[in-house]
Design a protein with these regions (language model features):
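A transmembrane-helix-recognition feature enriched in membrane-embedded lipid enzymes
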Residues: 1-61, 110-111
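Conserved H-X4-D acyltransferase segment
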Residues: 3-8, 44-98
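Catalytic core of membrane glycerolipid acyltransferases/transacylases, capturing the structured
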Residues: 23-40, 72-125
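Short amphipathic alpha-helical segments and helix-helix/interface helices
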Residues: 49, 87, 109, 135-136, ...
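Alpha-helical membrane-embedding segments
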Residues: 64-81, 107, 130-133, 139, ...
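A short acidic, often aromatic-flanked loop/helix-cap motif at beta-alpha or helix-coil junctions
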Residues: 67-69, 103-104, 124-128, 213-219
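Non-catalytic C-terminal accessory region of glycerolipid acyltransferases
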Residues: 129-260
């Protein structure tokens, strides 16, 4: 794993040293277009995931279903360190909420901003309302916006509490929610594991796009988060089977038509 992460850091260095300056010049001449950096990131992510697969560490099957065609808020569970990379690779024109601490440590702040990503609040220079406004702006520009309701990786073999932020974002933006379910067995570097201790054997990852959902009505975001969390727990086998209280057509608008 040390060698692999060395390659990962080398890729970041080359992106900062070569790719970012080239795209900066192109953006100065032709005008800024986040899709250029997103396209570059998707290529680099694809190479990294191919390397993990080739080393017998992590592999993923073909996703089940398709994401909603237009602007939406994408929400998901987060069982492992790299599941988000599959989503970045497979879902085009998607902005992502990125931990500001991670962006500073690598350092990738200019790359993420160039790609149209939004940095998470640090409660010092950036508050949650500023991040919310930036996310709404991205959605109104035509992007899908990806965020994790747990706000961090899931506990090993479990699921964290869903917060209401993503569902408030969907309501304020007046766009559908696109829930997707990630099953990772065994979890590849979950929250409790050290990055230098990969799981024994191949970790397999499956992604399932659920039916899009209309956003909650005003004041119902917390209840919506609680109910959707229960649905994920049921899918993970963490609670007794029960009928979900969530329906694709419940909300404050017309039921969105899912992509086929």
């Amino acid at each position: 794993m040390f060698a692999l992460f060395g390659i990962f850091l080398l890729g970041i260095f080359l992106e900062l040293l070569i790719t970012f300056p080239i795209l900066w010049v192109v953006n100065k001449i032709l005008g800024p277009k986040p899709y250029r950096m997103q396209w570059t990131i998707r290529i680099l992510v694809s190479l990294w995931l191919l390397l993990l697969r080739g080393c017998g560490l992590l592999r993923a099957g073909k996703p089940t279903g398709k994401p909603f065609d237009g602007s939406c808020v994408v929400v998901s569970n987060h069982p492992g360190l790299f599941d988000v990379l599959f989503l970045i690779r497979d879902v085009p024109q998607m902005s992502v909420m990125v931990k500001k601490s991670l962006a500073r440590k690598l350092p990738l702040v200019p790359v993420f901003r160039s790609a149209g990503y939004v940095l998470s609040p640090d409660f010092e220079q950036r508050g949650p309302f500023q991040c919310m406004d930036e996310a709404i702006e991205k959605i109104h520009m035509g992007y899908k916006f990806m965020t994790f309701p747990e706000a961090t990786r899931s506990p090993k073999g479990g699921l964290g509490k869903f917060n209401a932020g993503p569902f408030l974002l969907a309501r304020l933006s007046n766009v559908p929610l696109q829930p997707l379910f990630v099953r990772n067995n065994p979890p590849f570097l979950p929250k409790e594991d050290k990055w230098y201790f990969p799981p024994s054997g191949i970790s397999t990852l499956e992604i399932e796009f659920w039916e899009p959902m209309a956003p909650p009505r005003a004041g119902q975001e917390r209840e919506f988060a609680k109910n959707l969390e229960a649905r994920y727990r049921e899918a993970l086998g963490l609670t007794p089977e029960r009928k979900s209280t969530l329906g694709a057509g419940k909300g404050n608008g017309t039921e969105p038509t899912p992509s086929r």
